[in-house]
């Protein structure tokens, strides 16, 4: 934003003629004496964070008015100050926002936007009477530090007892997950835990899962066959889970036009961390979630109460957040990611709370299935909590009964977001820091903003909408799985993924050439049974082959020699039942091995091995 501030004896204007971008204005002429006249040009870069621009502009205007001892202010749109103008919609939003913020302390006159106007001005002519300012989107330091003053509690589900969080409680809290979450929320940093590379970053490279793509923007990844398989299996898992719970899959675009008021306003709720660009005469943004497309789809639907709750689901591939370069950390924080995103339309708050509870349990189930238990934090506005505390206590009690764990409760004094209540679930990484994954939110704003309606007889209702990601981003799920695998090594357990997610579930290793024919028969039987199996035909020592299987995190390593051929009993190393120092081995027939593996992966998504069967011809990607 460019501004020109004139300490004026008076400013007088008359609106003469509309342009095609003119606002409908009630005040078409006006005069103000003894005033600070602020000529304003809203620029393209202001679109990334209009809220910050408004606050920064108001800060500068108030400071100047105070220095000049002025109580009257004229806000005057003046496009000639810049050659890089923002969109008319953003300009109107910012000018009205400045007027509104100033009106609480000053007499304000705003000239209409988009009109040809005549004006007269008398400048006082002293050294401070003419000032120019460049206003940016950077949050002023005061606002950067400004936070909603929330209160945090530990909720004991057994007796509905709330204990407010303080230093004494933190020093005695034994639940590492809750402690990590609270330290994150309270911005308590521990020396040595903010630096260093998390173990999962080493794993994704070493195991040929994925890696940074140097020819792309920072925070974007290339995915190798093993990683693509894992990601696809996780995506299949969420798809099945959501459809089983009534979700209807859809697909929507990855970019949106910021000229659409609803899209721009919703995008502005998320601040400056967005990919925005200009193409031709359009200002576009890359989505950071599937909200935009799903809301536009719902806007065009003719919804009746019998259709609700209505759940639309999309695997948002990809979503984008322009995270700061210094904040990018492996799969935990990146700029391009895959977000499972479901939005549920509810007729009223009672239906929304019922759906919230169901989706809360659905989110917890994902932690059970991934073997990555969550710690949870509920967040409610004070008004919502007071009205619905019995419902919350019931949910907390059921959670305690099932998981034996307490939860965190955050109470916000008022609503600063589009939601009145939400729950976040997190796993804890090897540095003791939370990785927030599943979330459910009760949105009371977006239906009205996007024009989503439900027709109930002669009434038209703006419904309540739930936002739900049952797992969080696919990349963060994998991050949590790999961090959990590392934590196992601290307990003398070999790192491993759940068998249904492990790229190579079984590897068959012949002791000598004469064992190969029988070994290949075993390979084929395992593969025919849907078990991802490869065959180590490399000319390495037996010790090296077994070590390679360990490096590849193979869950079932089958060694076949003369004894196995004769007895038809296979020597199988079971990775997940082993310790680092003592491998667990069993003697199994092919049928018993197939039964063991298939029973373990039963009910989970399955895909074939996307690599050559023979290890000797599997390519090396790094």
Curated annotation (Swiss-Prot):
Superkingdom of source: Archaea
Name of the gene encoding the protein in the UniProt record: thrS
Cofactor(s) needed: Zn(2+)
Entry protein name: Threonine--tRNA ligase
Pfam families the UniProt entry points to: HGTP_anticodon, tRNA-synt_2b, tRNA-Thr_ED
CDD domains found in the cross-reference section: ThrRS_anticodon
Similarity field: Belongs to the class-II aminoacyl-tRNA synthetase family.
NCBIfam families per record: PRK03991.1, thrS
Chain segments carrying region Editing domain: 1-134
Cited PANTHER family: THREONINE--TRNA LIGASE, CHLOROPLASTIC_MITOCHONDRIAL 2 (PTHR11451:SF44), THREONINE-TRNA LIGASE (PTHR11451)
Lineage start: Archaea, Methanobacteriati, Methanobacteriota, Methanomada group, Methanococci
Catalysed reaction equations from the record: tRNA(Thr) + L-threonine + ATP = L-threonyl-tRNA(Thr) + AMP + diphosphate + H(+)
């Amino acid at each position: 934003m460019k501004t020109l501030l004139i300490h004026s004896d008076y400013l007088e204007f008359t609106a003469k003629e509309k342009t095609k971008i003119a606002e409908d204005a009630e005040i078409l002429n006006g005069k103000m004496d003894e005033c600070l006249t602020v000529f304003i040009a809203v620029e393209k870069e202001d679109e990334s964070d209009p809220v910050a621009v408004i606050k920064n502009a108001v800060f500068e205007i108030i400071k100047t008015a105070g220095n000049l001892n002025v109580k009257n202010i004229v806000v005057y749109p003046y496009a000639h100050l810049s050659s890089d103008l923002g969109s008319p919609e953003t300009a109107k939003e910012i000018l009205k926002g400045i007027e509104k913020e100033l009106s609480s302390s000053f007499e304000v006159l705003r000239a209409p936007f988009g009109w040809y106007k005549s004006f007269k001005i008398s400048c006082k002519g002293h050294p401070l009477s003419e000032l120019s300012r460049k206003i940016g989107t950077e949050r002023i330091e005061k606002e950067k530090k400004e936070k909603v003053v929330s209160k945090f509690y530990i909720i004991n589900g057994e007796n509905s007892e709330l204990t407010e969080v303080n230093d004494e409680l933190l020093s005695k809290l034994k639940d590492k997950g809750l402690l990590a979450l609270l330290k994150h929320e309270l911005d308590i940093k521990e020396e040595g835990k903010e630096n260093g590379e998390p173990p999962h970053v080493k794993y994704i490279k070493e195991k040929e899962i994925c890696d940074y793509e140097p020819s792309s923007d920072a925070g974007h990844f290339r995915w190798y066959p093993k990683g693509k398989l894992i990601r696809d299996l996780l995506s299949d898992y969420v798809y099945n889970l959501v459809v089983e719970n009534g979700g209807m899959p859809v697909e929507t675009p990855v970019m949106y036009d910021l000229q659409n008021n609803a899209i721009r306003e919703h995008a502005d709720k998320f601040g400056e961390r967005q990919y925005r660009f200009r193409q031709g005469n359009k200002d576009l943004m890359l989505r950071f979630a599937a909200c935009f497309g799903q809301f536009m789809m719902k806007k065009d639907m003719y919804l009746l109460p019998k259709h609700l709750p209505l759940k639309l689901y999309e695997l948002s591939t990809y979503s984008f957040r322009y995270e700061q370069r210094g904040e990018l950390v492996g799969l935990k924080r990146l700029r391009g990611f895959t977000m499972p995103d479901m939005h549920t339309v509810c007729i009223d708050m009672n239906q929304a709370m019922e759906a919230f509870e169901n989706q809360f349990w659905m989110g917890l189930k994902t932690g059970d299935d991934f073997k990555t238990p969550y710690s949870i934090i509920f967040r409610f506005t004070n008004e919502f909590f007071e009205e619905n505390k019995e419902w919350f206590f019931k949910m907390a009690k059921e959670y305690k009964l099932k998981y034996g764990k307490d939860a965190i409760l955050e109470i916000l004094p008022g609503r600063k977001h589009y939601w009145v209540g939400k729950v976040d679930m997190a796993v804890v990484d090897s540095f003791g820091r939370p990785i927030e994954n599943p979330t459910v939110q009760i949105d009371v704003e977006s239906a009205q903003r996007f024009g989503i309606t439900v027709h109930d007889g002669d009434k038209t209702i703006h419904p309540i909408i739930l936002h739900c990601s049952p797992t969080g981003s696919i990349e963060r799920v994998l991050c949590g799985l790999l961090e959990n695998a590392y934590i196992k090594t601290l307990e003398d357990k070999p790192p491993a993924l759940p068998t249904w997610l492990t790229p190579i579930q079984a590897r068959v290793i012949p002791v000598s050439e004469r064992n190969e024919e029988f070994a290949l028969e075993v390979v084929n039987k395992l593969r025919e049974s849907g078990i991802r199996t490869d065959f180590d035909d490399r000319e390495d020592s037996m010790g090296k082959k077994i070590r390679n299987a360990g490096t590849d995190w193979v869950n079932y390593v089958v060694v076949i020699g003369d004894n196995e051929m004769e007895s038809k009993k296979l020597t199988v190393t079971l990775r997940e039942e082993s310790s680092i120092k003592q491998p667990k081995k069993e003697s199994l027939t092919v049928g018993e091995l197939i039964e063991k593996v298939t029973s373990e992966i039963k009910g989970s998504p399955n895909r074939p091995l996307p690599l050559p069967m023979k290890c000797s011809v599997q390519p090396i990607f790094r």
